[in-house]
Regions:
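Metallo-beta-lactamase
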Residues: 12-68, 113-129
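Short catalytic/ligand-binding loop motif for oxyanion handling, primarily in non-cytosolic enzymes
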Residues: 3, 28-29, 141-143
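Short acidic/glycine-enriched loop/turn segments that link adjacent beta-strands
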Residues: 62, 72-75
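Beta-strand-connecting loop/turn residues
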Residues: 63, 82-83
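Divalent metal-coordination and catalytic microenvironments
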Residues: 1, 18, 69-72, 79, ...
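Activation segment
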Residues: 7, 22, 29, 94-95
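Cap/insert and terminal regions of metallo-dependent hydrolase folds
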Residues: 83-152
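Di-metal (Zn2+ and/or Mg2+/Mn2+) metal-binding site signature of metallo-dependent hydrolases
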Residues: 1-12, 75-79
């Protein structure tokens, strides 16, 4: 989810909307045991008026298309806009996981789903010749990722 930047959103981007898949929201807030979701519940309460839940068949503002990428979290999402694919937390160690998507970070909630999702999304990116950017990738210039990191 969006835990690290929550106060920036609340204090500096008061008019911002936070788009969260219904599966992600439901997984954290309604299905997760109380002893595991206390922080998420508090954060969602802080920004509840800014949250917009979406379905995966929706197109988000600016023509952004959400794609299912479950495993890291209950409703993890990657986002496509033209030839850019933002993969969020799908990859935590690019030097290892691009070559070995079967290796999981301890943060992945469902390891089997994470592995399957990484394989599917990386193949999708390669087949569609997409630029790939992620939250834990070591370069900030997404153009660095076309082909070179996505191809095996």
């Amino acid at each position: 989810m969006i835990f690290g930047n929550i106060f920036l959103i609340k204090w500096y981007f008061k008019n911002a909307k936070v788009y969260v898949s219904k599966e992600e929201y439901d997984g954290w807030i309604n299905k997760m045991p109380a002893d595991k979701n206390a922080l998420q519940v508090k954060i969602m309460k802080i920004i509840e008026k800014q949250i917009v839940q979406f379905d995966f068949n929706d197109t988000l503002p600016l023509g952004i298309k959400p794609l299912k990428a479950f495993g890291h979290t209950p409703g993890h999402t990657v986002y496509r806009k033209d030839d850019l694919l933002i993969i969020g937390d799908l990859i935590h160690g690019q030097d290892i996981q691009f070559k070995h998507p079967e290796i999981c970070a301890t943060y992945d909630h469902d390891e089997n789903a994470s592995i399957d999702t990484r394989k599917i999304i990386l193949k999708y990116a390669e087949d569609n010749k997409l630029f790939v950017a992620g939250m834990h990738m070591k370069y900030s210039n997404s153009s660095m990722y076309r082909g070179f990191y996505v191809k095996k």
